[in-house]
């Protein structure tokens, strides 16, 4: 995908996606700076570049996902590396204060942002950091960022992948998928909630539907049920649990399969259905509850996605969003569910930069405001 470079914005180049739970930041680090440019570069710009590229953690909660860095790409006619940084939305005031401390506002830079937080925190950027946000539509940014990242390739690796043999856990393996001809595509964006888009071309897409039961629901319920303190802790607990201790299965009701309607005995008939029994509540572990929560949320997303794919007549479904970060368990569940219930007609696809497409899409909007 070619990005116009007629109008080059002044450095630094950022794109922000301020979500309900996480802030995602894409930062372009130029590597083709001339001696003349370096001489003229103001101290505050050097300070920001050095701070962002020489650290992998910022404060107690900010993290640069080093493994996702895109090296030596060309953007707006400049060569550089693209960095990906995330931190909790509740820590955004600290980020704004850091920008103020590093004299960010003196650089006359353009700050493009998307996500609900671009509206919610606009006043804070202005009053605390003396910064003006240019707000961009989050679904536009999601689609543009996704198509751009897939087009530049992941340092020679495939950006897109799927799970082969999804129905056989011992043979299931991650495999690259060629997305050179991406249309049509159903994009399922799983953040705090879920949005589902039907993409027919780079300019022709629509939001089909969504659900409030997303990553925020998983972490919220897990925190209530298990006392976990973080997404990573919730996933760790889920990986050790058995959801069938909490869920009521078809076989618990029918004694086996419900053959007339093609329902296998292992299918979930009622999520958390076993928790109506006192003895079951007393024997279930926190790990079981975490696993059941993950399975409940993931199965619901998969079910809604499958219905949308059938209605829109699209057979490739790409799942993105930070709910899938370090969450191979859910990815394999989604891959299996789509393959099984569609009788092999639907393919679940995933992307390495799962949660950063909105931030990249915002970055791509820079020339429009320079």
UniProtKB/Swiss-Prot annotation:
GO cellular component, one term: cytosol
Tissue expression remark: Highly expressed in the liver.
InterPro entries: ATPase_NBD, Type_II_PanK
Residues the record lists as binding acetyl-CoA: 192, 195, 207
Subunit structure: Homodimer.
Family the UniProt entry places it in: Belongs to the type II pantothenate kinase family.
Protein name per the record: Pantothenate kinase 3
Gene: PANK3
């Amino acid at each position: 995908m070619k990005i116009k470079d007629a109008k080059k914005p002044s450095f630094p180049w950022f794109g922000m996606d301020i979500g309900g739970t996480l802030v995602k930041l894409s930062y372009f680090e130029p590597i083709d700076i001339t001696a003349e440019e370096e001489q003229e570069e103001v101290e505050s710009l050097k300070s920001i570049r050095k701070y962002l590229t020489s650290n992998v953690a910022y404060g107690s909660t900010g993290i640069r996902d080093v493994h996702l860095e895109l090296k030596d790409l060309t953007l707006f006619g400049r060569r550089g590396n693209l960095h990906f940084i995330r931190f909790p939305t509740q820590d955004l005031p600290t980020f704004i204060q850091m920008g103020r401390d590093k004299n960010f506002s003196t650089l006359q830079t353009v700050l493009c942002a998307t996500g609900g937080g671009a509206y919610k925190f606009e006043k804070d950027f202005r009053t605390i950091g003396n910064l003006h946000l240019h707000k961009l539509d989050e679904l536009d940014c999601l689609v543009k960022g996704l198509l751009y990242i897939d087009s530049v390739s992941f340092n020679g690796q495939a950006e897109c992948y799927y799970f082969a043999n999804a129905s056989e856990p011992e043979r299931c393996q991650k495999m690259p998928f060629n997305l050179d001809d991406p249309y049509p595509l159903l994009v399922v964006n799983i953040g705090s909630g879920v949005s589902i888009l039907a993409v027919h071309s780079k300019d022709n897409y629509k939001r089909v539907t969504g659900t409030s039961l997303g990553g925020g629901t998983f972490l919220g319920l897990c925190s209530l049920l298990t006392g976990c303190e973080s997404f990573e802790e919730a996933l760790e607990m889920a990986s050790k649990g058995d959801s069938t201790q909490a869920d009521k299965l078809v076989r618990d009701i029918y004694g086996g399969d419900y053959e007339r309607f093609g329902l296998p005995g292992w299918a979930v008939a009622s999520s958390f259905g076993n928790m109506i029994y006192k003895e079951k509540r007393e024997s279930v572990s926190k790990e079981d509850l975490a696993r059941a929560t993950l399975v409940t949320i993931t199965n619901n997303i998969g079910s809604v996605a499958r219905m949308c794919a059938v209605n829109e007549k699209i057979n490739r479904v790409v799942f993105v969003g930070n709910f899938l970060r370090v969450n191979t368990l859910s990815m394999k569940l989604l891959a299996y569910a789509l393959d099984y219930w569609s009788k092999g007609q639907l393919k679940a696809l995933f992307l390495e930069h799962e949660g950063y497409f909105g931030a990249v899409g915002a970055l791509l909007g820079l020339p429009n405001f320079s």
